Amino acid sequence: MNEEVFNRHEINYYLAESHYKSNNMEKANIIYKKLLDSMNSKYFSRSLNRVANIYLKQQDYNNSLIYYKKLEKNFKNNREKIESFIGILSNYFYLKKYDSVQLYSSRISQIENISFNNRNKINLLKAKSYLQNENKTAAIDMLINTINLVQDESAAEASYILAEIFFTEGKKTQALETLYSLNENFNTYENWVGNSYLLIAKIFISMDEKFQAKATLESLIDNTKIEEIKDLALNILNEIEDD
């Protein structure tokens, strides 16, 4: 590749990155795809990764899967290899191909040098797939594995899902204990903490503890910075007051 072509690829790549980081996904995608015309470019695999990720963000799971599978065959380093696998798993999950999630995750488990955070992403996808396939026992085991591996966002979500399972099974004390633990151990993940307090309020309502439910919701409304969580809390609070 001559220097002029290399410079053009470099300029295009960083222009695409600028659009990507500014959330101008359509413009970024057009430029990344131009960079895919040259497999010899050092920006080829990076652009594949971005295109696949953009389609995933746009919920175009079939196209995202296509590009992650291309990345799987053209990765330049271990990070891209692992990201291709997690991307493939994510798309299989959203496409409701739960058996494929289990099959692919068994392949990933054989790869070395996977960070705890990435292992937790994989564990969470497996757990959610088990739930969708109505294998609750396997799902609970995998959720607990996720929670115990490392205190990251996947573990926070796993804690919330586990509490939901306990609640639907009528194990309200276990559900509350799980949610209190979530709020204590994962307090930096505001979305999951907010959802946790919403579920705590619902559990209190189901126990006819309306005073505690109201106090929980009022505290959440006063403290959350997430408007969607605040709106949901207000709706539940209004329902209590209308009774």
Regions found by a protein language model. Give the residues of each.
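Acidic, polar-rich low-complexity tracts and alpha-helical solenoid repeat scaffolds
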Residues: 1-243
